[in-house]
Amino acid sequence: MVSRCSCLGVQCLLLSLLLLAAWEVGSGQLHYSVYEEARHGTFVGRIAQDLGLELAELVPRLFRVASKRHGDLLEVNLQNGILFVNSRIDREELCGRSVECSIHLEVIVDRPLQVFHVDVEVKDINDNPPRFSVTEQKLSIPESRLLDSRFPLEGASDADVGENALLTYKLSPNEYFVLDIINKKDKDKFPVLVLRKLLDREENPQLKLLLTATDGGKPEFTGSVSLLILVLDANDNAPIFDRPVYEVKMYENQVNQTLVIRLNASDSDEGINKEMMYSFSSLVPPTIRRKFWINERTGEIKVNDAIDFEDSNTYQIHVDVTDKGNPPMVGHCTVLVELLDENDNSPEVIVTSLSLPVKEDAQVGTVIALISVSDHDSGANGQVTCSLTPHVPFKLVSTYKNYYSLVLDSALDRERVSAYELVVTARDGGSPPLWATASVSVEVADVNDNAPAFAQPEYTVFVKENNPPGYHIFTVSAWDADAQENALVSYSLVERRLGERSLSSYVSVHAQSGKVYALQPLDHEELELLQFQVSARDGGVPPLGSNLTLQVFVLDENDNAPALLASPAGSAGGAVSELVLRSVGAGHVVAKVRAVDADSGYNAWLSYELQSAAVGARIPFRVGLYTGEISTTRALDEADSPRQRLLVLVKDHGEPSLTATATVLVSLVEGSQAPKASSRASVGVAPEVALVDVNVYLIIAICAVSSLLVLTLLLYTALRCSAAPTEGACGPVKPTLVCSSTVGSWSYSQQRRQRVCSGEGLPKADLMAFSPSLPPCPMVDVDGEDQSIGGDHSRKPRQPNPDWRYSASLRAGMHSSVHLEEAGILRAGPGGPDQQWPTVSSATPEPEAGEVSPPVGAGVNSNSWTFKYGPGNPKQSGPGELPDKFIIPGSPAIISIRQEPANSQIDKSDFITFGKKEETKKKKKKKKGNKTQEKKEKGNSTTDNSDQ
């Protein structure tokens, strides 16, 4: 069994040898070489020719090159059988620092199958410079190192091999070190610094050298590293005193711890070698050690016991100074102390009879304390003088020999200085003099000499009406510079009567916190401005106080619905009956719904709309959006119902809006069925026709006056602009918006005069803005919380102009008047405010939707007349509205200029003019004259002056 296994093993071995021989016969091995970084297409070898293959059989036999790791680096051209470089070859990437580097390829051909092995050696080129691992090497070398001391350095490395990696080193020139190269067994070299000159840290604490490494390639590359050599200190310098002998002269009887001398030694070393300790030498006797002591750290020699001239007049002290080096080094000096005879008794100061604290209102000359001084010496050494700390409101007055009084020299103010630390110095007449001091603490007691002060004299607060009782309006705060009870501030109202009621029925002030509360709901229609004073009183005796003016503006809310006014045809709020001829054309005014709203601003701006009729009904009427005038939209025909019931909805512009409904009954009649109506119409036509010309003349006159005013303003502006510019002449004027509705268009103006600027000229104050007399106070918007306060507080509130107030009856007639807020907007532009005045729109047919940008409704009082800041288009009358009334300020007259030409589709609207009383009277006289002349020319005997 064993022999059979042995025979089988021999047979296997012989078979393996035969297969290996056959493989070597069928396979071959080639060797090529190529330099790294060779370009693409670089020739490596004629591999087909070297393998004995014909070029024509490369493709049929499927000639191919295979490599396990680097198959894409080399490629064979099947057309010519040349092996060439296909991609970049980096020897350092392939083989690292290995000396031998090759690429192994397997060339395979079929028919029959043959495998050839090809080794391509990659030769190195010098493409890498020497590199150091760091840019700077630090070496710490003690200055005590001996000559020829060696300090190894970290060498450079080169990624190349062979001659390209052989490095040589070079050191920058210096006088302390030379460079030595050590060869390693692996042929690497590393540099070593060799000390050739002793180092001295005191002369050169550090050295900077440059080590350069150069490789052996062609061309050669270099790399460098900076060497920072830090010289460490060695204790090679002994401490040295400034002088070997010190001489000191001092008087006898010096107190303990009196400084005799401060010795100063220096050591050129550093660190612990520079730290020194002072001590008495072993040669100093014990008697001197008892009388003097030395501070081992600072070198100060001080008196430790009584020194008396009569015992010894000189002392010789030997002092050593030792550093903390290893080994320590010592320096020496001698101190000669010479004592001088002197006045050896100091004065004594005694302070008695203190009257503290001192009230700040104490009279000048008040005695604060008594001071006595004494000195046990005699003669000049026993004569004592006293002095006080300078720059204090006290002085010393001598009352008797060695007795003084501390008295008040000037007025005290506790708020400026609450306490004084006085130092009384007593000095005798010795040479040198001795002195003693005593401290006196004087506390200043407070008196009530400061009244509580508010941050500003007045504030403006805005509160919405209908507030709940106990609503927090504002918080006042005053500050008192005094202390304790004198600084406790309490607040109260300055009581006064508002009509028949007292102020305390409206508001209250919390005595401690200063919070102001509204005791009842405020009503804007009843009380627009609540102005009162809050008093702040301190707790002093007698108490001092000051007042603060608080202006509370009650902001309007939409809490009043529109109210219908009575008309000649019916009672207020009831149905109105009107007769209309079927022959009237489009645009004929049938009736006018009049309403008034007790609110202000947008809450009183009324609009009218016709309620929709039943489905399929034809209503030939419409209502003016802001005039309330019901007019025909077309010519009436037989198909129209003889009785029309119109529902007109009147609503304001508040949030939410409130409404009222008016009912108008219109009866359509034939001409023969309404003789009374016809007669009334014939009677009214004449004055209306006569009034047309009056309106034309009046409009022409107004335009002429306005043009003259504009020309005057332009001329005045040009003259002012031609003058020398003054700083701040045309600066931006900060507008203060102090009242705003929810839609943001109604505002109160803080300033009664507005500046008109042009270019760089002087400011203009000629243009008057009619506004309520609001004080230029800080604007505070109260919505349940206190708000920030700012603005100019230097002006006082002014009373509003009575010329711009209207009676209740006049307000009712202004249901469709154009307010100055809507017609004139003062806009702050780049060149200054730009004012637009109300104008009459052209008489063009109005659109179906009604008037656009309407005037405000009735019920708005004169306090709403103001200019408006900010951009935005001014609200103007609609294109189909012609003003039918002029309201002349200062006069209760309402001049009617209504005209109703036949077949006219023009709706009417009102606007208000403004001006002085004298100009108003002249215009009224002129209107009356024109009307009289028109009456005479046309023969009309009646004039409708109902609106006047």
Curated annotation (Swiss-Prot):
SUPFAM superfamilies: Cadherin-like. Residues 907-921 have a biased composition (Basic and acidic residues). CDD domains: Cadherin_repeat. The keyword Glycosyltransferase does not apply. One of its GO terms (molecular function) is calcium ion binding. Residues 29-132, 133-241, 242-349, 350-454, 455-564, 587-689 form the Cadherin domain. PROSITE patterns: CADHERIN_1, CADHERIN_2. Keywords: Calcium, Cell adhesion, Cell membrane, Glycoprotein, Membrane, Repeat, Signal, Transmembrane, Transmembrane helix. It is a single-pass type I membrane protein. PXXP repeats lie at residues 732-735, 772-775, 797-800, 830-833, 871-874, 889-892. One of its GO terms (biological process) is cell adhesion. Residues 732-892 are annotated as: 6 X 4 AA repeats of P-X-X-P. Residues 717-948 are cytoplasmic. Residues 1-28 form the signal peptide. Glycans are attached at residues 256, 264, 547. GO terms for cellular component: plasma membrane. Residues 783-804, 827-948 are annotated as: Disordered. Residues 29-695 are extracellular. The chain crosses the membrane at residues 696-716. It is found in: Cell membrane. Potential calcium-dependent cell-adhesion protein. May be involved in the establishment and maintenance of specific neuronal connections in the brain. This is Protocadherin alpha-10.
